[in-house]
């Protein structure tokens, strides 16, 4: 006696659904493996190259004005020009700089308004010259500011700080990383004697800056 097996449309639908699900799983697994491998390769390249932080040095700081409006209001008018070098020490990694803001400081007090520098790209082991003319108009300062400036004048020098904040992105081949915030801090010793009345007051020597990412 022969046997006849009959498969209902319902069973066929289930079988087809299983095949479609398996195909989707295979595609998902293939793409997941591909992207995981790609990310692993990028990570390994990153570890091998290990980008070094950029180097900054303040070559000159010139003070054109640093005056309190009145001794009672403690408002400061100032103008300072800064010149610094930026170096990318990496042999195979480029750097994009974005949203650069720079200002001058004295004893932890901001003595100029922030000035923005144009974004730029720095190639392997490249050195760039950056300049910024900073000004401040009626900036509030501490009550002791005038006294501190008088003491600095009697010593013949004043220490001015330069601070820069911004974002950078690493470039390895055609791959560009996400943005990292970085900060640069520099100190400059500027001649500031009693007999020095004609601006600008120039820095005595260049200084190496500290960079944090």
Swiss-Prot record:
The keyword Glycoprotein applies. One of its GO terms (biological process) is phloem loading. Keywords: Cell junction, Endoplasmic reticulum, Glycoprotein, Membrane, Transmembrane, Transmembrane helix. GO terms for cellular component: endoplasmic reticulum; endoplasmic reticulum membrane; plasmodesmatal endoplasmic reticulum. The chain crosses the membrane at residues 28-48. Disruption phenotype: No visible phenotype under normal growth conditions. Expressed in the vasculature of roots, rosette leaves, stems, cauline leaves and flowers. Specifically expressed in phloem. It is a single-pass membrane protein. Residues 1-27 are cytoplasmic. Glycans are attached at residues 67, 77, 195. Residues 49-213 are lumenal. Its main location: other. InterPro entries: LEA_2 (IPR004864), NDR1-like (IPR044839). It is found in: Cell junction, Plasmodesma; Endoplasmic reticulum membrane. It comes from the Eukaryota. Induction: Induced by senescence. Down-regulated by sucrose, glucose and fructose. Signal peptide: none annotated. Involved in the regulation of sugar, amino acid and some primary metabolite export from companion cells (CCs) to sieve elements (SEs) in phloem. Required for apoplastic phloem sugar loading in source leaves in order to transport it to sink tissues. Required for correct sugar partitioning between source leaves and sink organs. Plants over-expressing NHL26 exhibit slow growth, accumulate high levels of carbohydrates in mature leaves, have increased shoot biomass, decreased root biomass and decreased seed yield. This is NDR1/HIN1-like protein 26. The gene is NHL26.
């Amino acid at each position: 006696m022969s046997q006849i097996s009959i498969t209902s449309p319902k069973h066929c639908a289930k079988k087809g659904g299983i095949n479609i699900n398996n195909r989707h799983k295979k595609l998902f697994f293939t793409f997941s493996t591909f992207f995981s491998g790609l990310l692993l390769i990028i990570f390994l390249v990153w570890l091998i190259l290990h980008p070094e932080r950029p180097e900054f040095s303040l070559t000159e700081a010139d003070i054109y004005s640093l005056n309190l409006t009145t001794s009672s209001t403690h408002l400061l008018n100032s103008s300072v020009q800064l010149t610094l070098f930026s170096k990318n020490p990496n042999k195979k990694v480029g750097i994009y700089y974005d949203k650069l803001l720079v200002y001058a400081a004295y004893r932890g007090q901001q003595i100029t308004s922030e000035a923005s520098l144009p974004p730029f790209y720095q190639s392997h082991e490249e050195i760039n010259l950056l300049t910024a003319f900073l000004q401040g108009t009626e900036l509030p300062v501490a009550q002791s500011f005038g006294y501190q400036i008088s003491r600095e004048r009697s010593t013949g020098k004043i220490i001015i700080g330069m601070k820069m904040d911004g974002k950078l992105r690493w470039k390895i081949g055609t791959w560009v990383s996400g943005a990292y915030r970085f900060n640069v801090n520099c100190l400059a010793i500027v001649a500031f004697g009693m007999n020095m009345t004609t601006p600008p007051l120039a820095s005595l020597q260049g200084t190496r800056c500290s960079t944090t990412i």
